[in-house]
Every structure is written in structure tokens, then in C-alpha cells.
Swiss-Prot record:
PROSITE patterns: IMP_1, IMP_2. It comes from Mus musculus. Its EC number is 3.1.3.7, 3.1.3.57. This is 3'(2'),5'-bisphosphate nucleotidase 1. The gene is Bpnt1. It comes from the Eukaryota. The keyword Magnesium applies. The modification N-acetylalanine is found at A2. Phosphatase that converts 3'(2')-phosphoadenosine 5'-phosphate (PAP) to AMP and adenosine 3'-phosphate 5'-phosphosulfate (PAPS) to adenosine 5'-phosphosulfate (APS). Is also able to hydrolyze inositol 1,4-bisphosphate (Ins(1,4)P2) and inositol 1,3,4-trisphosphate (Ins(1,3,4)P3), and is not active on Ins(1)P, Ins(4)P, Ins(3,4)P2, Ins(1,4,5)P3, Ins(1,3,4,5)P4, Ins(1,3,4,5,6)P5 or InsP6. Probably prevents the toxic accumulation of PAP, a compound which inhibits a variety of proteins, including PAPS-utilizing enzymes such as sulfotransferases, and RNA processing enzymes. Belongs to the inositol monophosphatase superfamily. Pfam families: Inositol_P. Mg(2+) 3 binds at E74. SUPFAM superfamilies: Carbohydrate phosphatase. Optimum pH is approximately 7.5.
Length: 308
């Protein structure tokens, strides 16, 4: 019975099923051939039909089941009736079998803030770089990201017709992260992943100071954190404003649950309470291992230019 499970684990189990449905919606929009692209603030800040439908699906599905939640989504959508086909009311039973970490067992619905990025890597989505795309649902308590779900709609899309398309990664602090194979980047190598479409001199200066062996430029914050946990990159460095709370909330949980660290460029933890400003104005610095190496190499000039 649902009542025997904690609010947090019921929410995570529901968000998992909702994220899977979101992945299906993302694939359907591509298959139909009309992305419905709208330019928001610039040529690199885009919104598609998938962004709109997925946000409606996630936010409405969560709000129906958990009416006291605070839900903050990336897209500014007009209120209105949501098509019943977009509603997902299932929950992933495997998650309900897991124990809730004791520090979260008494959390109430109204204590939680959910940060939603319906399509992280929208620009890449419009350009056919489908492996960059993720759906992000992050859950915060007392300003801290404590649970997260990442759906990769096109995971395996280049692995041949017999490969299962898409996957969902999830994690809860104090419990762990699941749905992927943890792998560390090669020891002694500094492989840095950073922005593909929002670079500037600060970003370049910060990365150069870290003596990188390789620099990967890819889309999506969720995608970059997946690179860290799967050993494709050693650090994620973005010394610039631009990234928002819905970009980092879910990925941060997955990284922290396996022993990594994500902060702003100054080393401060990011805050996720409902009143906080949405922009991560002091950038992002993350690593699975050896975080201190990267933090110690951030130039003072870069820190001085980025005010938290």
C-alpha cells in the first residue's frame, strides 16, 4: 500500500515513471518531424514542442499526485487544461522496495521543491545531437538537492536496431545512484567537459589553468554529469553564468550519491530552496574524483569576475 512508503520514495518512484513517459514524448516529437522551434532570448536559447509537452506532462502528473509540492519548471507556459494523454500516474515499484534514508523519512510533501528541466540540451536536440539530450527532475529539501532522476531518451540510439532505446538514472543521497555502470576517468588525465554553445573568455581561461589533456565540448548539464560518472571526463567546468537550478539539481544528486562533488566556481554548495534565484551566477565546477585539484586551479581573476 502506498501509505506504508515515505513521501520521498513515493515521489521518486512516481518521478521515475513520469521521466520515462517524458522520454517517450521526446522521441515522438522527433518521429513526427515537426519540432515547433521557438526562439526565447537568443539563437542559442530555444524551446521546442518537446520542451512544452514534456513540462506539461511532468508538472501536471506530479501536481495531481502531490498537490502540496512546489514545482519549478524551465519553461514559462500559460496555464490551461492538460491533455489526459500527457498524464502519467504510475510509479516504479523497484524504487518502492528500497529503504528511505532515515534523515528523510519524516519529510512532508510541502517541504519539497522539485526543479524540472523538460529538455536539457534543446539546441543539440534541434541539431540532431540526440545523445546530448536529457530530461531532468531534481528534488530538494531545505535548500539541498537530495534526489534526482535523469532520463536519456536517446541512450543507445547509435547502437543498432536491436538495442533498447533510452534509459533512466536515479539517485537519493544516503541510498545511492542506479541505472548506470559507475566508471572513473583514466587516472592522471585531466579530461574536461564544458559548454558547447555558451563559451567565452572566462570559460577558456579557467579551463586552460587546469592544464587539460583533452577538452570535450558537449551540450546539456545532465549529459556532462553522465560523462563524469561513466569515466568519459574527469571534471565539468563552466566558469560563467548561464546554467540554471533546473539544469544542476538532478545531476548534482547523482554525482554526490557516488562520491563526487558539484559546486559553484568558488566552491560554494548550490542552494535549491523555492525563493532562490534561478541562475547559477557563479558557474559550475564538478568532478567525480580529485575535485580539489580542479578547485585549486581556478584563477583568482575568474573568481573575481563571477559573483555568487
Amino acid at each position: 500500500m502506498a501509505s506504508s512508503h515515505t513521501v520521498l520514495m513515493r515521489l521518486v518512484a512516481s518521478a521515475y515513471s513520469i521521466a520515462q513517459k517524458a522520454g517517450t514524448i521526446v522521441r515522438c516529437v522527433i518521429a513526427e518531424g515537426d519540432l515547433g522551434i521557438v526562439q526565447k532570448t537568443s539563437a542559442t536559447d530555444l524551446q521546442t514542442k518537446a520542451d512544452r509537452l514534456v513540462q506539461m506532462s511532468i508538472c501536471s502528473s506530479l501536481a495531481r499526485k502531490f498537490p502540496k509540492l512546489t514545482i519549478i519548471g524551465e519553461e514559462d507556459l500559460p496555464p490551461g487544461e492538460v491533455d489526459q494523454e500527457l498524464i502519467e500516474d504510475g510509479q516504479w515499484e523497484e524504487i518502492l522496495k528500497q529503504p528511505c534514508p532515515s534523515q528523510y523519512s519524516a519529510i512532508k510533501e510541502e517541504d519539497l521543491v522539485v526543479w524540472v528541466d523538460p529538455l536539457d540540451g534543446t539546441k543539440e536536440y534541434t541539431e540532431g545531437l540526440l545523445d546530448n539530450v536529457t530530461v531532468l527532475i531534481g528534488i530538494a529539501y531545505e535548500g539541498k538537492a537530495i534526489a534526482g532522476i535523469i532520463n536519456q531518451p536517446y541512450y543507445n540510439y547509435q547502437a543498432g536496431p536491436d538495442a533498447a532505446l533510452g534509459r533512466t538514472i536515479w539517485g537519493v543521497l544516503g541510498l545511492g545512484a542506479f541505472g548506470f555502470q559507475l566508471k572513473e576517468a583514466p587516472a592522471g588525465k585531466h579530461i574536461i567537459t564544458t559548454t558547447r554553445s555558451h563559451s567565452n573568455q572566462l570559460v577558456t581561461d579557467c579551463i586552460s589553468a587546469m592544464n587539460p589533456d583533452t577538452v570535450l565540448r558537449v551540450g546539456g548539464a545532465g549529459n556532462k554529469i553522465i560523462q563524469l560518472i561513466e569515466g568519459k571526463a574527469s571534471a565539468y567546468v563552466f566558469a560563467s553564468p548561464g546554467c540554471k537550478k533546473w539544469d544542476t539539481c538532478a545531476p548534482e544528486v547523482i554525482l554526490h550519491a557516488v562520491g563526487g562533488k558539484l559546486t559553484d566556481i568558488h566552491g560554494n554548495a548550490l542552494q535549491y530552496n523555492k525563493e532562490v534565484k534561478h541562475m547559477n551566477s557563479a558557474g559550475v565546477l564538478a568532478a567525480l574524483r580529485n575535485y580539489e585539484y580542479y578547485a585549486s586551479h581556478v584563477p583568482e581573476s575568474v573568481k573575481n569576475a563571477l559573483i555568487p
